[in-house]
Amino acid sequence: MKSITQRLENVVKLQAKRWENEDYWDDINDLLIKELEDILALEPQNTSALINLGAVLSDSGENENALKILKTAVDLGSEDKNLYTNIAIVMVDLGINPEHYHEYLETAENFTENPLTFKAFFDPNAY
């Protein structure tokens, strides 16, 4: 049986493949969500899994649910740059006032990225 760390490493690799295989985007998203939910069933406070699930949900347009999950990782004390960046991305997508999401971007600058997490997609040209 694979360790949680190995499973998260595979999630990061699979997430990168979404962008290379857009024809299979939905199928890969479903696999990512299932794997992350399985990890969270074993370790409900795994902040890397929460951050990645929030990113996948954001990429799927489920921003309110993504924000709730990401804020859970904040409440658990995560100091991952990708967490705070992802919260800002979700807040932009939800149309929240810039002064609110700028706080998260500023906080993100104080941390480093965990290699077991990834950023949600953000298209600055869409705004």
Where in this protein do the model-derived segments appear?
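Alpha-helical tetratricopeptide repeat
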Residues: 4-20, 33, 47, 51-52, ...
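A conserved position within tetratricopeptide repeats
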Residues: 37-40, 74, 108-109, 116
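Alpha-solenoid helical repeat scaffolds
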Residues: 51-52, 82-87, 102-103, 116-123
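Short coil turns that delineate tetratricopeptide repeat
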Residues: 44, 78, 112-113
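Single-residue signature of alpha-solenoid repeat helices
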Residues: 32, 66, 100-101
